[in-house]
Regions:
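Domain-level recognition of soluble alpha/beta enzyme cores
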Residues: 123-153, 158
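Active-site catalytic microenvironments for nucleophilic, acid-base chemistry
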Residues: 40, 65, 69, 96, ...
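A glycine-rich beta-strand to alpha-helix segment
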Residues: 101-119
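Short, flexible helix/strand-to-coil boundary loops that buttress conserved ligand/catalytic motifs
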Residues: 18, 117-121, 146
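Glycine-rich phosphate-binding loop signature in dinucleotide/nucleotide-binding domains
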Residues: 44-46, 97-102
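Active-site-proximal alpha-helix that buttresses catalytic centers in soluble enzyme cores
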Residues: 2-3, 7-81, 85, 89, ...
Length: 168
C-alpha cells in the first residue's frame, strides 16, 4: 500500500504588491494554520517518509512549520516542477517516486492539487489554503498509480480545527 499526503500551502500575504507570486510569504493566518495542521497530522497519521515541496516561499514556509510542529524527520526535497504544476505534471512526479517510500507528502498549489485529488479519487473536494488530503492506494510501486484508484481517507482543513484560523 502507498499513501499520498497532499498539502496546499498556508494562506499567503498580498501586502507587498511588488513581490513576485513566487516570493510571497505567509500571512499571519498562514503562520497560525500551518503548525496547527502539522499537529493534527502528528495525531492522525500517517507520517510521510518524504516531503516534496514547491520552491515558492509560501510552500517552503508551510512545510517547515508543519514539519516542526509534527516533529517530522522526513526527508525534504524542493522540486522546481511542483510550482504551478497541473495534475498531469504531478502524476509524472508521483510515478517517479522511490519505491521504498510508503508515504509521501507533496506541498503545492491550486488548481493542481484540487485537480489531482479529483483525478486520483474521483471525488471533487475543495482544497482551501493549508488543506491536507490523505489518499491511499492498493499498489506496491508508485509507477503503478492510476486515475480513480485512490481512496480519500480524510481531508483536513484549518476550519475543521476551530475558529482560531479565521481571526486576522
Amino acid at each position: 500500500m502507498k499513501t499520498l499526503l497532499l498539502l496546499r500551502h498556508a494562506k499567503s500575504s498580498w501586502d507587498e504588491p511588488s513581490l513576485r507570486d513566487f516570493d510571497r510569504p505567509l500571512a499571519p493566518r498562514g503562520k497560525r494554520d500551518a503548525p496547527r495542521i502539522g499537529k493534527a497530522l502528528s495525531e492522525r497519521g500517517p507520517l510521510p517518509d518524504l516531503a516534496i515541496s514547491s520552491p515558492a516561499a509560501r510552500t517552503r514556509a508551510t512545510i517547515k512549520a508543519v514539519m516542526a510542529s509534527a516533529r517530522l524527520e522526513a526527508e525534504l526535497q524542493v522540486e522546481e516542477s511542483v510550482y504551478g504544476a497541473s495534475s498531469a505534471e504531478l502524476m509524472k512526479l508521483i510515478r517517479r517516486l522511490p519505491g521504498e517510500k510508503a508515504c509521501v507528502m507533496i506541498v503545492g498549489h491550486n488548481p493542481g492539487l484540487e485537480d489531482l485529488v479529483a483525478r486520483l479519487t474521483g471525488e471533487t473536494e475543495r482544497m482551501p489554503t493549508a488543506a491536507l488530503a490523505c489518499v491511499e492506494f492498493q499498489i506496491d510501486r508508485w509507477k503503478d498509480i492510476e486515475d480513480g484508484e485512490g481512496k480519500l481517507v480524510w481531508l483536513l482543513t484549518p476550519k475543521q480545527l476551530g475558529h482560531e484560523s479565521e481571526k486576522e
